[in-house]
Amino acid sequence: MTVRIGLILLLAMVSVSSTSLVVRSVATVPALVLAFWRMFTASGMLWSYSVIRPAGKLSPINKKRIIFAGIFLGCHFACFFLGIRNTSIANATLLGCVAPIFTVIISIFQKKKINKMTYVGLIIAIVGGGIVQSGDISLNSANLFGNSIALLSALFLAITFVLAEEIRQETANVVYGRSLFFVASITVLFIAATAGDSILNFKPGDIPWFLFLGLVPSIFGHNLLNYAVKYITPTAVSSVPLGEPIIASLFGLLLFGEAIPFGALLGGPVVLIGVYIIIKHQAVSADD
């Protein structure tokens, strides 16, 4: 991995870490409404950029692939935003960032070569996730619901990156991002309508937050991750947000006075160790 890609991934990690803080800061806006405007705004920005600097078109096969990728990305954001509203920042970010575990599982089903140590890391990460959930033993617990959909959001993100790996090999990142975010916004719009949320349920003062979400965590965050997936594996790319729990939880404590849950405090390092092992040995397998 080059220094340039490393710096891009660092910027992406810092950028995506701002999402959970914004969701908490505009608590009056429904989670699904926030998710929609984040995707729609990001798409609009990239389409506007394309007018200034045309970047090409999608091939017929990639048009089909991007529809699926956009649907899964939309489901990811819908689940992640709802997760933040229904559990702690620490739990939501920890469980929402274990996508590398799912990319490994997908690789197994694709019959790709997997290093044995990757399985060890997978087991460790799963155990860590269990520890994070351990404080929410009641099936009626709001935290259990939030934790579960945050975990589901990680699965959707993993599928998105697996699809992105194929699309990005022959598609410019701006072309991919503008279409991906647009399909994702339509997906969230459908989910919001099904849930009875109106995308117009916000105040004029919330618009700057929508623009922030579209620019910082979306374009400087996820869109840069989409750029990197052309050069490194989906597992490596999906591991970048692992820094988010540390950053977001710290800001959650400082800005909202939210104590880091004991389960997340204890299980968080276990999850990170497990995913680190996955990434390290996934890279070894890729080189082989």
Where are these regions (language model features)?
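Specific alpha-helical transmembrane segments that line the substrate/conduction pathway
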Residues: 33-35, 39-43, 81-113, 153, ...
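Helix-helix packing/entry segments at the starts of transmembrane helices
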Residues: 6, 37, 92-98, 164-185, ...
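Transmembrane alpha-helical segments that form core, pore/gating elements
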Residues: 13, 43-46, 103-104, 109, ...
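Glycine-/small-residue-enriched transmembrane alpha-helix faces in small-molecule transporters
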Residues: 1-36, 68-71, 75, 79, ...
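Juxtamembrane C-cap of transmembrane helices in multi-pass membrane transport proteins
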Residues: 12-29, 41, 78-87, 95, ...
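Specific transmembrane alpha-helical segments of multi-pass solute transporters/efflux pumps
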Residues: 51-91, 96, 131, 214-232
